């Protein structure tokens, strides 16, 4: 085999991607570009061998979010390949969300070699710095070019990445300088592939196992504040662990509940199973109604705080002990700064607690009086909602939050976009998300990447329902440019309130109508059927819940992407919802 640069570029690209596949990469999002050609050609050959799936995206921003959706739904490391220059800067929004939501993703970016840096060379920028503030690691192959990178150096880069994902998952930026020639002849490619398949493809690589040791001293220091003879509440926020660890998480949560007998408040995206004992339905409304009457000694908080003003006020005013247990998240996670934080996860915490208390599987406490009271309060709120939210009502956002979990099949996954949907579902969904996988990207809580994230999830978990407002949907409309996006089994429930409805709840009363629209609402007069037609996406508009049920059946049956639009009157929505909330609080 010739030792030319083009052959070395191709061989090292094959070796790098092959090693990334060995540490868990199954899906690769490829963006267009010339500098990344050796990586793209190598990816294509590995795809032919059945080792990795490739999907292309002409927009790097959408590609980043699409890959993040795949990572969240699969629990596996995902990969994006881009060319150099501004292409890399477009990855930042997805990197921010991956950082905050602790999801494993590698951004593999081609770059110019060192000799072209800082001299005015075309499309040559300081891209190695673009993602550094949010990535767990920023790594690089040889600065002179990947052709000068040794095999053991590539292995070391992948080993570092694998170790990072095992301890504190998140985004990694792997920058790959590549010198010309970028293309490779048919003959040279054939020769390199022969060498790669004969020597490297089936070669066994041993990655050092990461032994994640718990800090028993830290556990004892924190757990001494618990008093299991006193009442408490378990608060489960958005789940940040791997979806593959949800069974062990729920097993540990069930054991913890049996040890304590405490009630459980579960976020719509907590990952908690719906059959958990002590699960309080309508807990946010119960909390709002009884905010000064819920007395207990301690709170066990799992994961980040839910998006609930009522819960935040309750935690701020709570005078007892608060313990916060995190899933492989080593950063501070308590904005009210009142908790003892434990970094090693619920499964580890529960295991140590059982050993410390000498508890076996047969020990099971009855539900505490507080748990029984809260269960009853939740049932009373449920009756009020049942009497005021019916399928005959006009469609509103809060009614959608209550009824859609009953209309969409109980085992089918749902994704809730940021802004209004996640908040409405927390208040009104009555734990309806807990029978299924439910996703919402609450790391940075932005509307960025909504469509691309949903398309990524639907590659793994489908048929998927995305619940989104019109602005969040439009913000990421380029998601439709991802390869075969219209063939995903994805239903989009498009809540059309002609602008950012959440701002109606916050700023409208203090601004003139024209000011409010220009500064916050930002309405867009969209011809939705034409927009859907332009992207070749199936479309329906419905005006009542009966038609919505029929539309769901239709969208699932066609097994392709579909938009189902419902129009909302924001002013009527606010008045009706406030009236219902007043009825609940006064009951």
From Swiss-Prot:
The keyword Aminoacyl-tRNA synthetase does not apply. InterPro entries: MenaQ_synth_MenD, THDP-binding, Thiamin_PyroP_enz_TPP-bd_dom, TPP_enzyme_TPP-bd. The lineage of its organism: Bacteria, Bacillati, Cyanobacteriota, Cyanophyceae, Synechococcales. Binds 1 thiamine pyrophosphate per subunit. This is 2-succinyl-5-enolpyruvyl-6-hydroxy-3-cyclohexene-1-carboxylate synthase. GO terms for molecular function: 2-succinyl-5-enolpyruvyl-6-hydroxy-3-cyclohexene-1-carboxylic-acid synthase activity; magnesium ion binding; manganese ion binding; thiamine pyrophosphate binding. Catalyzes the thiamine diphosphate-dependent decarboxylation of 2-oxoglutarate and the subsequent addition of the resulting succinic semialdehyde-thiamine pyrophosphate anion to isochorismate to yield 2-succinyl-5-enolpyruvyl-6-hydroxy-3-cyclohexene-1-carboxylate (SEPHCHC). It catalyses: isochorismate + 2-oxoglutarate + H(+) = 5-enolpyruvoyl-6-hydroxy-2-succinyl-cyclohex-3-ene-1-carboxylate + CO2. One of its GO terms (biological process) is menaquinone biosynthetic process. It comes from Prochlorococcus marinus (strain AS9601). Its cofactor is Mg(2+); Mn(2+); thiamine diphosphate. Homodimer. Transmembrane segments: none annotated. Belongs to the TPP enzyme family. MenD subfamily. Keywords: Magnesium, Manganese, Metal-binding, Thiamine pyrophosphate, Transferase. It comes from the Bacteria. Its EC number is 2.2.1.9. Pathway: Quinol/quinone metabolism; 1,4-dihydroxy-2-naphthoate biosynthesis; 1,4-dihydroxy-2-naphthoate from chorismate: step 2/7; Cofactor biosynthesis; phylloquinone biosynthesis.
């Amino acid at each position: 085999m010739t030792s030319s640069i083009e052959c070395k570029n191709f061989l090292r690209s094959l070796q790098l991607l092959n090693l990334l596949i060995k540490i868990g990469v199954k899906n690769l999002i490829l963006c267009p570009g010339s500098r990344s050609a050796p990586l793209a050609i190598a990816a294509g050959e590995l795809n032919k061998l059945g080792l990795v799936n490739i999907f292309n995206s002409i927009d790097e921003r959408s590609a980043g979010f699409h890959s993040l959706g795949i990572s969240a739904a699969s629990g596996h490391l995902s990969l994006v390949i881009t060319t150099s220059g501004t292409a890399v800067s477009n990855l930042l929004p997805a990197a921010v969300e991956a950082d905050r939501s602790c999801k494993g993703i590698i951004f593999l970016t081609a770059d110019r070699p060192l000799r072209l840096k800082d001299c005015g060379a075309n499309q040559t920028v300081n891209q190695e710095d673009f993602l550094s503030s949010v990535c767990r690691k920023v790594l690089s192959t040889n600065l002179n070019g990947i052709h000068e990178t040794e095999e053991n150096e590539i292995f070391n880069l992948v080993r570092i990445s694998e170790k990072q994902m095992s301890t504190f998952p998140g985004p990694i930026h792997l920058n790959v300088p590549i010198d010309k020639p970028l293309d490779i002849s048919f003959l040279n490619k054939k020769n390199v592939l022969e060498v790669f398949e004969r020597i490297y493809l089936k070669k066994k690589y041993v990655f050092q196992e990461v032994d994640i040791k718990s800090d028993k001293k830290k556990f004892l220091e924190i757990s001494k504040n618990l008093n299991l003879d006193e009442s408490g509440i378990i608060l489960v926020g958005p789940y940040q662990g791997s979806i593959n660890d949800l069974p062990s998480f729920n097993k540990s949560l069930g054991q913890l509940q049996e040890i304590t007998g405490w009630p459980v408040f579960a976020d719509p995206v907590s990952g908690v199973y719906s059959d958990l004992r002590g699960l309080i339905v309508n807990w946010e409304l119960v909390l709002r109604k009884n905010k000064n009457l819920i007395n207990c000694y301690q709170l066990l908080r799992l994961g980040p705080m839910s998006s609930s003003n009522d819960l935040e006020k309750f935690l701020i005013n709570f005078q007892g002990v608060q313990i916060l247990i995190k899933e492989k998240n080593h950063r501070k996670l308590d904005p009210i700064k009142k908790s003892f934080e434990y970094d090693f996860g619920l499964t580890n915490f529960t295991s140590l607690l059982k050993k410390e208390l000498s508890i076996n599987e047969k020990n099971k406490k009855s539900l505490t009086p507080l748990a029984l009271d809260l269960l009853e309060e939740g049932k009373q709120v449920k009756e009020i909602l049942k009497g005021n939210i019916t399928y005959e009502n006009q469609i509103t956002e809060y009614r959608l939050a209550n009824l859609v979990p009953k209309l969409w099949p109980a085992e089918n996954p749902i994704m809730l976009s940021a802004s209004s949907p996640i908040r409405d579902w927390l208040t009104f969904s009555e734990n309806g998300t807990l029978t299924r996988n439910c996703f919402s990207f609450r790391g940075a809580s932005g509307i960025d990447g909504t469509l691309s994230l949903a398309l990524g999830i639907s590659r793994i978990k489908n048929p998927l329902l995305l619940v989104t407002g019109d602005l969040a949907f439009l913000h990421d409309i380029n998601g439709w440019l991802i390869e075969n996006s219209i063939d995903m089994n994805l239903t989009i429930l498009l809540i059309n309130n002609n602008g950012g409805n959440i701002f109606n709840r916050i700023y409208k009363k203090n601004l003139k109508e024209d000011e409010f629209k220009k500064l916050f609402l930002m309405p867009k007069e969209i011809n939705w059927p034409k927009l859907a037609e332009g992207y070749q996406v199936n479309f329906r508009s419905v005006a009542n819940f009966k038609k919505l049920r029929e539309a769901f059946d239709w969208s699932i049956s066609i097994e392709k992407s579909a938009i189902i639009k419902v129009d909302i009157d924001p002013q009527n929505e606010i008045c009706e919802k406030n009236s219902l909330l007043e009825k609940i609080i006064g009951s």
